[in-house]
Amino acid sequence: AMDVQKPDVVLALGKRSLLTVNAAKRPAPLVLGAVRDVDYQYPGILMIPDPEVILERLLLLAPDVKRVHVVQKGEGEDIQLRGAKEYLASRGVELDIRHSNDLREAASIYADMLEKANASDAVWILQDGSYVNSAIFSLLLDAAWNKNLVVFSSNPLHVKHGALFAVYPDNKKMGASLGEIANQVLQKRAEP
């Protein structure tokens, strides 16, 4: 269809759309939206919530929190945490990031974390789940009730299962922003 219609710019929503567009050897510039991976070299919008938005909400709802625990999959930088440590430090809150390479290691980390936690602690579940399966989620929620901990998530699905809150995208604003990016791509292409 792209060969026949020859669009000026292509908007791909999600990884599957990107793969389809790339397989079609698109002749037009690409704007990418609704992906969770930063490895793509296209202009667009990621579906990863800004950590400052999440942490600001946490501190509004639970102002007594002094330490936030998070389990990160693997080593290295995680875009979901970019700027989080500095943001929390500026508000007198510590960010405790622990790294896990598999579910078993994560379960051990969560158990250790919860054993030492108190009412001034919060547990942040990252969007990818941070190896949180139903058993670990139940463990987190039990500790939340027993120790008066805050459990919050970057994944909206966790709220219906008991997380205090999560954030979700404003799809209309995201669509408008993607349209603006597409227009910017077209304008730059038209400039000498």
Give the location of each predicted region.
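Short hydrophobic alpha-helices and adjacent helix-cap/hinge residues
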Residues: A1-P192
